[in-house]
Amino acid sequence: MISFGLLLTFATLATWLQPAAANAQDAAQIARGAYLARVGDCVACHTSRRDQPFAGGLPMETPFGTIYSTNITPDLRHGIGSYSYDDFAAALRKGVAKDGHLLYPAMPYPSFSKVSDTDTRALYAYFMHGVRPIDQPNPQTRLHFPFNLRVMLTGWNLLFRPAGAYRADPAQGAAWNRGAYLVQGLAHCGACHTPHGVMGEEKAFDARGTDLYLSGYTLAGWHAPDLRAGHGTGERSRDSIVQLLRTGRSHGSATFGGMSEVVENSTQYFSDADLHAVADYLGSLHPDRAPPTPAAAPPVKPDATTALRSGVTPTGGALLYLDNCNACHRSDGSGAMKAFPALAGNAVVTSDDPSSVIHVILTGSRMPSTRSDPAPLAMPAFGWRLSDPQVAELATFVRSSWGNRGSPVNAADVAKVRQQVDPAQLKRIRAAVTNEVTDDGAPGPTGK
């Protein structure tokens, strides 16, 4: 009788403990999926309103037209609530929706094809059970003919989509392979930092047999810099890479443009191990060819620092710098640690492609708000009141002072970038500063 009682007790405990263990396992998988969604920065493209995360509707301008991100909440009508795991995996890694239509590669499924089954299952668990369903319809993507014909994507996938999951390099350690897996896969760094072809395809998805992977790319007036060691931002130390990805700030530099959003939404949440793994991988990438010899910069005499401090401004660019930039970036171009990035010796400033420095002058910039540095310090925009020749003079001065050897910028370079800036954005900035009323009736902060 006693034995039967003990058996019954153990059976009852087992019945109670099994669901508890399963629930704990499910919770752990959902939490891992949430982390992986951070790594993939899914929220950046699939959110158009902060109060509706992952509900889609964000317009993305491409050379082929406007693509709208889709609702990836577990909503049954407009989201992915009816997706099985296999449906989800096919969309994530092959670019095929549940109903069979092909997704446009603005969704970086070529990179996501490298994501493991284990991580894909964790992502599925998160999006099905950790995300709030939102009943928001998907806007219609509008691409120019013939790119609006999705059947063309069949050929695109045959030509450009990489095959299979990430292949570990046995010659490298675990940390290096982890970094490569993240950079090439979920983090999809190549989507911005690798050159694209005429069909919008990335020219490489890893560094095997090519010198193009992560070598820099310009799109929509922004230049995503070369990430390889010895080139551009690749010149920084591994610790500096970790700090930049965690805080958006490192010694003498800061993120800008879309990268600030990446830090704010994604990389600041990476584990320490993953941050160091990414830094190890990026630090190992060495291009086969030597860096190009910098173009000879026009001399600025007397020395820029001396001239600015003495009030002697022999060029229009120097005067523009003194009027607009000197207070924050200082007369020696050194900036202020963690507040205003240095311009002297800044690889982004002296990049062969000046698009980003022009864009920042035109539209301003904002540092990310992170857990370690919550203040989103911002640089004001000057495009609303500086002409193209003035912006060119200012950019040339910055790119050729304090030992910088960037090539000159001309007004045509500025005009090209300005054409890619939404005119309404500059009008809103002007209204905010001058209290004018914009064409759409929006006043400045104290406008009537």
What does each of the following model-derived ranges do?
Residues 42-45, 189-192, 325-328:
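Short cysteine clusters
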Residues 26-28, 47-67, 98-105, 109-180, ...:
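Flexible coil segments in periplasmic/lumen-exposed cytochrome c-class electron-transfer proteins
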Residues 316-359, 375:
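C-terminal structural cap/anchor segments
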Residues 3-18:
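Bacterial N-terminal signal peptides
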Residues 28-47:
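Mature N-terminal segment immediately following signal peptide/propeptide cleavage
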Residues 56, 70-75:
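N-terminal post-signal-peptidase region of extra-cytosolic proteins
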Residues 75-95, 112, 180, 195-196, ...:
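A structural feature that tracks compact, well-ordered secondary-structure segments
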